[in-house]
């Protein structure tokens, strides 16, 4: 008898799992439910559509429902899962265009419900000039605003990953951009001295960064904070995301930090036969050993692949995360992996940090730019615990060398001895990673 796999969520984790399971077991009847208009899309590319670097959101779609159908996966679009009956092995779904509800039976279940932009209870946050950025379906109205934003006042609430990328997008459109951050710097995980380099980059493109200011209210033409008011024709939220786990919680699945779903290393939840992956889940941090909520596209795809392998009858294990990430703001690149000093100390390590200043290429090469690297290590053993980079073009992807070292529990001394490449257009003789 043909077994049926139901997948809730049609983006990275869900469709990675669906595709992997179908490849491993072609006999599986795979049905996916997606409440939106798109499947398998690259949400990380949204800021570059808004900034005009990418022509259309359609370019961000890796595989359409029709293409999934060609591979034997039936995707039900604009169909939302609204209730799980895990005891009865069934899912209640609602067709959003008709309101019709029905129960769908399953033999295996994959939950990939993703995350939603944080929307704190601020007066005016539901006004029509306030937008969140997470899903392609939300982009068209925001893109219209971006395309006519030259000379207008745009306020970005939050100076995290998405806020920094949006700052570049709207600045390139000619908008007057103000970023509001409740903390004392942009990208709170960065060491303070590297964060100052980022601040300089933000201000160099004409963006105002206002730190230590909490938003009190959003008006029709301004945003009020604890320190004052700023004109705002358009407000965009960049406060991070929260996992979409109400279905999982109601079904009795164990939740962890930030309310993310807890799974074992096979991506199985606390309910046998039910798997989960992606931005709705937490993951084990390889350095701290603790569960952490770090929603990244790389993690979603990797977890989805593991879940799909196991749903398809295989035996795969998810090895954990480091939280490795890169981003850029015009000429400034940022890379980070592992724990910063405060996080390492909180995790119980006797940790120290060292920051060095170097160049992206040989110092005499015409494209050479400054790069600063902070390395965090355990005192005594020298084991690497984290690495943070801020610098010019060619800086950020150096973080992958550090991530590889962290993944394999290398010491700072061992990393310094690695035979890294050298040519004047690419690095100094001693690469900044080796020096740090």
State the predicted function of each range.
Residues 8-12, 20-27, 35, 329-337, ...:
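Flexible, glycine-rich terminal cap/loop adjacent to redox cofactors
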